């Protein structure tokens, strides 16, 4: 049993009294319930099995109680009994639980007839029950105001408050017994006990507060406002300048009424005012009142998604007050906003803005600012912008959302010459309507003095000590300005290789990767988020088996890298050996020159030549392993640690547009960027994503609108290259020479919901194909037309574009090296590509690469859509990031359930109980269950096939997460082999089900009659028919945000 030092823990009885927590009473209550249910005599000893059961349940309840007390929660007797009841059900003891509930109801009725309650005489002559919890609450408010506590009250302070409350209650009882007592007398006792305990400052503030309240009751407001009603509780609020004012609940009701005006049928301003008022205290700061209001709205999002817009409205109004000095209700808001924008830009050098922004026509730009677009944001979007994206000066935010979008747009149009005002307005209208969003580094830095706008950097590390540390130093510089990094380490010699200069033996690549890991965590991204990188190693490297274990939680910490990502760079030959159950040879790179640069049939020829040198004794440092054994170890580590990710070397190179000027040696932090890198070039890519949701009209893609969006987006991405601040000369050289950009998408799952298409269907596959083809068509065309205006990129001559290849054409090249049976890719198309081919032949291309689908974790949160091409993770879950925790309900699901009359508190409890899944909720129709399958309920083949259809059109890669609901080695192997055969170039995270789930202790299992899943004989999900497409598979047995 959990040992409890009882003097340190108190709980609250039903009459409000604080008493010591006594775990023996839980055991005794459980014993009584068991004896009653099992008809056991009180005098007879308990059977051993029952005694053990009672002890186990007591242990679990005590553990939960202590956890809640340690978090600063006030635990009541009722709450403990709820926990006991819940644990009885979880333990399968429903009969005991029922008797326990009956016993509780009887005791409740008996208590209702009791008359031994002290009465308080209020100031208006009325009476109320004496409640010590109100004393405790008043004390806590006084302590918080005096000690200037923000956030949760520290446990030590709560303990002091509990002790004081006990002494005050004892005084009240000893002085008055069961007689009625005046409220003023209780407050006198509170003052006395504060002084006796030595809390003089708290007592002083408490006395001043009582005097202020007395004056407010005695006098009318001097400005002619209505008199404070004595019965209405008020709080003293401290303004930033030190002055104070009194706040009533009716004041909060007015604030919430304004915020809720757009949603009168779905939101309740009175409810929010009640909730917010409960969290106030005397002496509270003005910004804490705003926080309490926002938290009240935020707490209701899970049951009604419209509260996300209420919370956003409240935060936006607070932002206006901070930035503009007026609230959202000010009739002159628009004019104040325009004036502030112009002053902000004109004084921008003081605020780290690019001084060239002053050269714009600020009057014209200010007229375009549209504050009504702020209403598009949900709470998560505004909070993300507020916490990390808006420009700050001495702790004060200088931007509203619309000024932020305009600052970014102005920064992106600086190279547009005489047309820069036109393009700044055009860019603003695109960004502020959520049609397209640049990646986070661009949002951070566009229009700023140091305009580092690029998302991804890829570099290779040479087998030379000075170059190793140069790359590590470069990593620090790149990460400082919010870039995500991919490092190729394959060229560094393996453990045991001879160092010719010293005649010593190399320690291999692992110690150097450890140094890179420590550098990544030492440099955070512009002070706004953690630095992030991914290291790549080909799986023929002799240190590869050690590389597999870099993310393990056990072993030598000097050979562990817990803070960076790892990825395997795998040639096709390995999978061919795996298919034939052949052997695989590991080499030190210094013994096999040219192997890392080779791919396809050339790699196979060279690799086999080196294997013959092993047999002849020319190469002595090597290791032979069974390909199948190594593959199992790769998958085992992937499942255990989430790393190394699986990426495919040959399709990344064979299908590369730039095969004439180098080799793709690795991918980036999020595995979607595939660019050449070398000792003289650090590959750079600039990212942005189209919001598909804004391009659906009449239940189909609006092709004309999408064409316009893509054309402007490609222009923005190309501008980034010329406007960018380059931390290293190698990055500048690569970006200006090849001008790679990565246009992606987000909101794919949202669109499927709007079109009533299940992700697990052929319809989703076809839509993925159609959508990707349209985007590729207009993206390539836009880059070519931009070449007409601005000229081709420097290394265009000899590229695949120049040789007449489009991305779709390169699949045939992959088939030539792999064999058609290993390239199971649909190559159909619907559009006539002749105009695109003719335009490229005539004008060339402005950008070497044009498309890549990044994860978009952050920017999709800003605009309120699902990430990238990801399926819905859960229909109700809590998301954590640097801005805090956010409850995420699936608004599309709730809308459907409302239409069917099924959305209620019970359904919300069901969603929590079943961890955000619908499959076992009996009253949800099967057609909705199929439409709203979560990521772990969709067979991986569907996700892979949808991605395969995209990948055929995309010239770089797709950041693709894969999901595995249960540990299954064969299924895991088949999943990745299918991805390889389906032509994917890379994969990203392997997501597995978390061991934890939604908090269920507040769910009344008995009342709702939920049958726990462990008691089910037949799942409600067994009647669902999910369309599945047969895919040939092998039968072998068994978070960065730079791209976001």
UniProtKB/Swiss-Prot annotation:
The record marks 1040, 1043 as: Interacts with thioredoxin/glutaredoxin. The record marks 988-989 as: Important for electron transfer. The record marks 456, 685 as: Important for hydrogen atom transfer. SUPFAM superfamilies: PFL-like glycyl radical enzymes, R1 subunit of ribonucleotide reductase, N-terminal domain. It catalyses: a 2'-deoxyribonucleoside 5'-diphosphate + [thioredoxin]-disulfide + H2O = a ribonucleoside 5'-diphosphate + [thioredoxin]-dithiol. One of its GO terms (biological process) is deoxyribonucleotide biosynthetic process. The active site is at 668 (proton acceptor), 670 (cysteine radical intermediate), 672 (proton acceptor). Keywords: Allosteric enzyme, ATP-binding, Deoxyribonucleotide synthesis, Disulfide bond, Nucleotide-binding, Oxidoreductase, Repeat. Disulfide bonds join 456-685. The record marks 463, 493 as: Allosteric effector binding. GO terms for molecular function: ATP binding; ribonucleoside-diphosphate reductase activity, thioredoxin disulfide as acceptor. Provides the precursors necessary for DNA synthesis. Catalyzes the biosynthesis of deoxyribonucleotides from the corresponding ribonucleotides. Tetramer of two alpha and two beta subunits. This is Ribonucleoside-diphosphate reductase subunit alpha.
């Amino acid at each position: 049993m959990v040992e409890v030092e009882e003097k340190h823990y108190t709980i609250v009885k039903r009459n409000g009294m604080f008493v010591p927590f006594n775990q023996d009473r839980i055991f005794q209550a459980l014993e009584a319930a068991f004896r009653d249910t099992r008809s056991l005599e009180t005098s007879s000893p308990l059977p051993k099995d029952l005694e053990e059961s009672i002890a186990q349940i007591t242990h679990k309840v005590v553990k939960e109680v202590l956890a809640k007390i340690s978090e600063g929660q006030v635990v009541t007797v009722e709450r403990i009994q709820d926990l006991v009841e819940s644990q009885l059900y979880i333990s399968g003891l429903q009969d005991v639980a029922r008797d326990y509930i009956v016993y509780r109801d009887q005791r409740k009725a008996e208590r209702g007839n009791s008359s031994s309650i002290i009465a308080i005489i209020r100031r208006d002559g009325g009476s109320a029950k004496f409640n010590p919890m109100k004393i405790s609450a008043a004390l806590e408010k006084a302590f918080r105001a005096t000690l200037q506590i923000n956030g949760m009250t520290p446990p030590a302070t709560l303990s002091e408050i509990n002790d004081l409350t006990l002494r005050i209650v004892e005084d009240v009882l000893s002085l008055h017994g069961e007689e009625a007592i005046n409220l003023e007398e209780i407050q006198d006792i509170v003052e006395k006990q504060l002084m006796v305990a030595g809390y003089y400052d708290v007592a002083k503030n408490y006395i001043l507060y009582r005097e202020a309240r007395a004056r407010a009751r005695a006098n009318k407001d001097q400005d002619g406002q209505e008199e404070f009603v004595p019965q209405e509780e008020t709080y003293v609020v401290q303004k930033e300048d030190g002055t104070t004012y009194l706040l009533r609940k009716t004041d909060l009701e007015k604030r919430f009424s304004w915020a809720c005006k757009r949603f009168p049928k779905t939101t309740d301003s009175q409810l929010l005012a009640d909730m917010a008022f409960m969290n106030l205290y005397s002496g509270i700061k003005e910004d804490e009142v705003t926080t309490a209001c926002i938290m009240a709205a935020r707490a209701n999002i899970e049951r009604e998604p419209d509260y996300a817009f209420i919370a956003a409205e409240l935060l936006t109004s607070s932002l206006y007050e901070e930035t503009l000095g007026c609230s959202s209700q000010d009739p002159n808001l628009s004019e104040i906003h325009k004036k502030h924008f112009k002053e902000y830009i004109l004084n921008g050098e003081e605020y780290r803005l690019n001084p060239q922004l002053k050269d714009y026509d600020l009057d014209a730009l200010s007229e375009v600012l549209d504050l009504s677009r702020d209403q598009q944001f949900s709470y998560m979007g505004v909070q993300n912008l507020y916490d990390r994206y808006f420009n700050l000066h001495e702790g004060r935010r200088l931007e509203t959302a619309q000024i932020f979008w305009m600052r970014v747009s102005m920064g992106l149009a600086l190279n547009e010459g005489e047309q820069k005002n036109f393009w700044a307005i055009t860019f603003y209208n695109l960004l502020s309507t959520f049609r397209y969003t640049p990646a986070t580094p661009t949002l951070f830095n566009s229009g700023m003095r140091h305009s580092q706008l690029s998302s991804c950097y890829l570099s290779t590390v040479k087998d030379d000590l000075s170059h190793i540390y140069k790359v590590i130093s470069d990593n620090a510089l790149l990460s400082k300005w919010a870039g995500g990094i991919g490092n190729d380490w394959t060229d560094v010699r393996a453990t045991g290789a001879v160092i010719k200069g010293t005649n010593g033996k190399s320690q291999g690549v692992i110690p150097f990767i450890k140094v890179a890991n420590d550098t990544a965590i030492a440099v955070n991204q512009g002070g706004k988020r953690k630095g992030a990188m991914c290291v790549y190693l080909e799986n023929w490297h002799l240190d590869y088996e050690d590389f597999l274990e870099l993310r393990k939680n056990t072993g030598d910490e000097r050979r562990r890298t817990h803070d960076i990502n790892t990825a395997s760079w795998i040639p096709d030959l390995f999978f061919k050996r795996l298919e034939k159950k052949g052997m695989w040879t590991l080499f030190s790179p210094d013994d096999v020159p040219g192997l890392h640069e080779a791919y396809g049939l050339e790699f196979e020829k060279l690799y086999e030549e080196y294997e013959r040198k092993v047999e002849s004794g020319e190469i002595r440092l090597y290791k032979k392993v069974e390909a199948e054994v190594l593959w199992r170890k790769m998958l085992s580590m992937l499942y255990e640690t989430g790393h190394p990710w699986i990426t495919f070397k040959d399709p990344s190179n064979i299908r590369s547009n730039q095969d004439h000027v180098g080799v793709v040696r690795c991918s980036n932090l999020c595995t979607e960027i595939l660019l050449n890198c070398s000792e003289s070039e650090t590959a750079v890519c600039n990212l942005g994503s189209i919001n598909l949701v804004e391009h659906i009209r009449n239940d189909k893609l609006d092709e004309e609108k999408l064409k316009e969006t893509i054309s402007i987006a490609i222009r923005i991405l190309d501008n980034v290259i010329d406007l960018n601040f380059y931390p290293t000369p190698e990055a500048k050289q690569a970006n200006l020479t090849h001008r790679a950009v990565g246009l992606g998408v987000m909101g794919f799952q949202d669109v499927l919901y709007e079109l009533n298409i299940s992700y697990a269907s052929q319809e989703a596959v076809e839509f993925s194909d159609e959508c990707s083809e349209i985007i590729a068509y207009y993206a390539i065309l836009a880059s070519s037309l931009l070449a007409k205006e601005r000229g081709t990129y420097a290394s265009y001559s000899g590229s695949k574009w120049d040789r007449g290849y489009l991305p779709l054409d390169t699949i045939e090249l992959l088939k030539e090296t792999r064999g058609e049976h290993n390239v199971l890719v649909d190559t159909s198309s619907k559009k006539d590509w002749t105009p695109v081919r003719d335009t490229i032949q005539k004008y060339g291309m402005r950008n070497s690469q044009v498309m890549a689908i990044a994860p978009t974790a952050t920017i999709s949160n800003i605009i309120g859509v699902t990430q990238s091409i990801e399926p819905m993770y859960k229909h109700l879950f809590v998301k954590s990031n640097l801005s805090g925790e956010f409850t995420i309900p699936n608004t599309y699901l709730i809308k459907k359930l409302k239409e069917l009359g099924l959305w209620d508190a019970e359904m919300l409890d069901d969603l929590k109980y079943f961890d955000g899944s619908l499959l076992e909720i009996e009253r949800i129709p099967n057609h909705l269950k199929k439409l709203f399958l979560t990521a772990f309920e969709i067979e991986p083949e569907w996700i892979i096939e949808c991605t395969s259809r995209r990948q055929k059109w995309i010239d770089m890669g797709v950041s693709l997460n894969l999901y595995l609901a249960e540990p299954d080695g064969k299924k895991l192997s088949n999943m990745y082999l299918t991805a390889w055969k389906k032509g994917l170039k890379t994969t990203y995270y392997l997501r597995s089900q978390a061991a934890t789930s939604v908090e269920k202790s507040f769910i009344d299992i008995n009342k709702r009659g939920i049958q726990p899943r462990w008691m089910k004989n037949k799942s409600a999900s067994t009647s669902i028919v999910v369309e599945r497409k047969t895919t040939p598979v092998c039968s072998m047995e068994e978070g960065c945000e730079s791209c976001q």
